[in-house]
C-alpha cells in the first residue's frame, strides 16, 4: 500500500540460497506402506510441488530415478520441518542423509556454505564447546563474558555443524543456547576431517 500520488516499489527481499540437500524417496523398506497413506512417487511429487508454492527457500529437482527427488533447503531445521509436516499429513517417504551444497567460484574453486554461530553458555562449559567447534573447523570471531556466561561467536562450515545441536545440548547440560544463520559461501579448505 502506498500513496497513489507517489507510488514507490518496495525493496526486493533477499532469499538465502539453499545450503543443504536431501533426497526424498519412495519408501522401499520391508515395512513400506504401514506408516502413511500417501506412498507413491506421484504423491510425493505433488506434495513437493504444493510446498514450492509457499516455501520460497526450497528447491526441488528431479533425479535420474523416478522414485527420488533432490530437495534443497536453507539448513537442517528447514528440511526437517518439511519432512515432519509431510509425515503428519500421511506421507510415507525415505530420506537420505543431508549433503552440503558445494558451489564453484568464478575462478573454478570449490566453495562451501559457512554459518555464523552465536553461543551463550555457562563459563564452566565454554572450554568443551570451544574445543568441539575448533575440531569442526570453526573460526572464533569474538568471545566475551558476563555474569558467569560466555558469549562465543564463530564462523563454522555447515558440514561441520551437521548433527552438532544434540552434542551441544549434552555438553552444556541444556543450559546453553545456540543461534545459527547463513554467513557466506567461502573457499573450501582441504579439511581432512570436520568432526
Positions of PLM-derived features:
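Accessory interaction regions appended to the cores of large information-processing enzymes
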Residues: 1-195
Amino acid at each position: 500500500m502506498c500513496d497513489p500520488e507517489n507510488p514507490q516499489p518496495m525493496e526486493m527481499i533477499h532469499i538465502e540460497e539453499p545450503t543443504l540437500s536431501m533426497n526424498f524417496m519412495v519408501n522401499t523398506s520391508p515395512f513400506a506402506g504401514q506408516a502413511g497413506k500417501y506412498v507413491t512417487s506421484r504423491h510425493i511429487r505433488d506434495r513437493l510441488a504444493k510446498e514450492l508454492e509457499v516455501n520460497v527457500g526450497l528447491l526441488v529437482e528431479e533425479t535420474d530415478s523416478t522414485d527420488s527427488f533432490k530437495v534443497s533447503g536453507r539448513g537442517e531445521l528447514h528440511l526437517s520441518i518439511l519432512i515432519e509436516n509431510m509425515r503428519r499429513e500421511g506421507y510415507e517417504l525415505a530420506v537420505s542423509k543431508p549433503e552440503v551444497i558445494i558451489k564453484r567460484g568464478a575462478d573454478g574453486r570449490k566453495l562451501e556454505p559457512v554459518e555464523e554461530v552465536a553461543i551463550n553458555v555457562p563459563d564452566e562449559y565454554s572450554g568443551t564447546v570451544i574445543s568441539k567447534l575448533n575440531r569442526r573447523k570453526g573460526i572464533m570471531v569474538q568471545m566475551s563474558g558476563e555474569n558467569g556466561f560466555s558469549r562465543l561467536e564463530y564462523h563454522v562450515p555447515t558440514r561441520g555443524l551437521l548433527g552438532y545441536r544434540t552434542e551441544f545440548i549434552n555438553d552444556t547440560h541444556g543450559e546453553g543456547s545456540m543461534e545459527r544463520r547463513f554467513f557466506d559461501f567461502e573457499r573450501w579448505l582441504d579439511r581432512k576431517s570436520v568432526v
